[in-house]
């Protein structure tokens, strides 16, 4: 029941019974009313247009005067103007309502975006603070306290002169298609073969004396220089720009042909056709199709 002693409780009970309408609900309700009125005006206008000829016929039959006909036409025109004016006012009101709704929606979206941006920035700050605190509280490891090593990476363990073992020497017999990479110390690191080859490696173990070690290292460096000088290999292929006949830029296999005493690049179909019909016939450069080559 409604408590009349307390005004706040009375308002609370009334709000429970009669819910408060929001601006959006009121606007949508008014928009529905405007659309109903516009529809009614259009219906009345259509009725006037459809029945005006009946009024004219009735005036001519009953009165037979052009003066009365002029009055009837004036009344119809005034009625139509009134309908137009009412519709124009309703359209303006409808436009105003839609503009206000759009503005309210835009403000709401901007407010939500601002709130989400501030929340994201706050969360990023919290995360960065947690990371900083974690880094500060992290204990030092034993590796961090170890001083850097004074030995260089290129240093080698010292051995007695009489016990020093010479570096091994490797001789490789290869075919022209083999590619051998050697280090500056004379050791063979990589061996890449493009065709089948017989490779024989002989390793000579040197004596333990200093003089023998010196001669072996000199011989190894000389052999490395000789081997690197004798390197031979097929040069890398240069991809042709286009076919001499059909101007094709891509093919599975490039062939050669002689035109005007010069070697020209041909695609696979044009090269096969060239080999079939003769190598020394002139082919016109203006042909674009391989079906009418050498015709």
Swiss-Prot record:
SUPFAM superfamilies: Glucocorticoid receptor-like (DNA-binding domain) (SSF57716). Keywords: DNA-binding, Metal-binding, Zinc, Zinc-finger. It comes from Dictyostelium discoideum (Social amoeba). GO terms for molecular function: sequence-specific DNA binding; zinc ion binding. Residues 229-241 bind DNA. Residues 127-145 have a biased composition (Polar residues). A zinc finger (GATA-type) spans 243-270. Residues 115-126, 146-163, 181-227 have a biased composition (Low complexity). It comes from the Eukaryota. Residues 115-240 are annotated as: Disordered. This is GATA zinc finger domain-containing protein 23. One of its GO terms (biological process) is regulation of DNA-templated transcription. Residues 164-174 have a biased composition (Basic residues). Pfam families: GATA. SMART domains: ZnF_GATA.
